């Protein structure tokens, strides 16, 4: 009985020490540490690849090719969306499937959008972490863009430079 108790106590101690050792993925933590190292002070938004609605509109007007990646749910797509020529609609819960990652260009700027910017920030961070360096996030989401443009023109194609 004493031997069984000692064995169980030893096994429990070993299990608890292993759990503490594996509390988080140290390799992934190192990757995030490098990724977030430049996120400091007034330039934090730029380091996080955040773009304000007015900056986005100016880039489109100048003729920059920007691929909008809308990560909202299919039900949300019908309310209002991004009227850019190369826009992609991939819900965040489908985004990291191989066939969807293959749709995201690596040679153009990709602007991740959602309603408020929360899901886009998460998706953009994860995409950059796996190697998509050309990914940016629309600060404040489509709601902020609509507020910047105005209700009448928010869902119309943006004028391009001609």
Q: What do these predicted ranges mean?
A:
Residues 9-17:
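Bacterial N-terminal signal peptides
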Residues 68-70:
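Structural scaffold elements adjacent to functional motifs in cytosolic proteins
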Residues 112-114:
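Short, surface-exposed ligand- or partner-binding patches at beta-edge/loop junctions that are enriched
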């Amino acid at each position: 009985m004493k031997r069984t108790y000692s064995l169980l106590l030893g096994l429990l101690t070993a299990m608890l020490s292993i759990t503490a050792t594996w509390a988080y993925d140290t390799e992934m933590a190192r990757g995030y540490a490098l990724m977030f190292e430049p996120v400091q002070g007034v330039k934090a938004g730029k380091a996080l690849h955040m773009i304000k609605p007015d900056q986005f509109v100016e880039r489109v007007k100048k003729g920059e090719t920007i691929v909008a990646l809308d990560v909202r749910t299919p039900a949300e797509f019908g309310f209002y969306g991004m009227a850019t020529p190369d826009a992609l609609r991939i819900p965040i819960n489908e985004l990291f499937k191989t066939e969807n990652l293959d749709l995201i260009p690596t040679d153009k700027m990709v602007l991740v959008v959602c309603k408020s910017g929360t899901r886009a920030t998460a998706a953009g961070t994860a995409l950059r972490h796996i190697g998509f360096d050309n990914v940016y996030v629309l600060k404040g989401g489509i709601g902020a863009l609509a507020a910047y443009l105005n209700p009448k023109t928010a869902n119309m194609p943006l004028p391009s430079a001609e």
